[in-house]
UniProtKB/Swiss-Prot annotation:
This is FAD assembly factor SdhE. It comes from the Bacteria. One of its GO terms (cellular component) is cytoplasm. SUPFAM superfamilies: YgfY-like. One of its GO terms (biological process) is succinate metabolic process.
Amino acid sequence: MTQYNKLRIEWDCRRGMLELDNVIMPFYRQHFDALSDTQKDTFIRLLACSDLQLFSWFFNRGMATDPQLQQMVDYIQKTLKLTD
């Protein structure tokens, strides 16, 4: 089992756009611990992306070119019921 620096991850969840804060932080607080290590690693990689990229992906204006990142975006949208 991998150790994760949860304080660092929580800090990285804080974004410059309120819309992203309203997606990423609730997902982190409610669902991060239940993710597999692979999913956790992907979520952490997702946090390294720019706010503009994340906004585009979460609000269906584009798709991530990395399939793992897109799967995580889709999973977060489904989990938080952001899509139909």
